[in-house]
């Protein structure tokens, strides 16, 4: 069994779309998930465009050339310089605990260093222990907690 990661390409669009839909279906199980789903636009049929976007990096990963997960990070800027934020990282449920998520994070860290970014951020929902642990294993630690209240109810 060989774990791999590589940059995503237009030929990955169909599998990326399917994985994104699978990831979105689990958002409601976490506090803040439905709002995150509303705030973060679905790439959907636009994956072939997104993998060519210079402001974004998409990595795919899996086992023996079969894509089972992905990571999308978007460039941004802060006072100290250029950064990237991991907006989506997901591995299909049946392929978890093989190291695919760790490999995706490692690839994104290597990419960010190669791009001379000053930081790589990632987002995780409250209660999403798997994602939080994935980040922690890779050295990404909490630096900010966002709190909210629903003012419409």
Predicted stretch roles:
Residues 1-14, 29, 153:
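Conserved N-terminal entry element of GNAT/NAT acetyltransferase domains
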Residues 21-46:
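Conserved GNAT-fold acetyl-CoA-binding loop/helix
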Residues 98, 102, 114, 126-144, ...:
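Conserved active-site alpha-helix within GNAT-family acetyltransferase domains
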Residues 76-87, 96, 142-144:
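A conserved beta-turn-beta hairpin within the catalytic core of GNAT-like acetyltransferases
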Residues 60, 66-75, 85, 90:
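Conserved beta-strand in the GNAT
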Residues 112-124:
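Conserved GNAT acetyl-CoA-binding A-motif
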Residues 45-60:
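A short helix-loop-beta-strand connector motif used in the catalytic cores of GNAT acetyltransferases and
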């Amino acid at each position: 069994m060989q774990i791999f990661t590589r940059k995503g390409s237009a030929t990955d669009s169909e599998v990326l779309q399917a994985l994104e839909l699978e990831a979105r279906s689990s958002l409601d199980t976490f506090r803040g998930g439905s709002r995150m789903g509303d705030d973060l636009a679905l790439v959907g049929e636009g994956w072939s465009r997104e993998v060519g976007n210079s402001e974004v990096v998409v990595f795919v990963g899996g086992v023996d050339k079969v894509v089972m997960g992905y990571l999308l990070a978007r460039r941004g800027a802060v006072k100290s310089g250029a950064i990237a934020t991991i907006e989506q990282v997901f591995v299909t449920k049946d392929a978890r605990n093989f190291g695919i998520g760790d490999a995706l994070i490692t690839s994104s860290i290597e990419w960010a260093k190669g791009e001379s970014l000053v930081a790589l951020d990632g987002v995780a929902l409250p209660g999403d222990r798997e994602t939080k642990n994935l980040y922690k294993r890779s050295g990404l630690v909490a630096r900010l907690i966002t709190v909210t209240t629903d003012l419409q109810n």
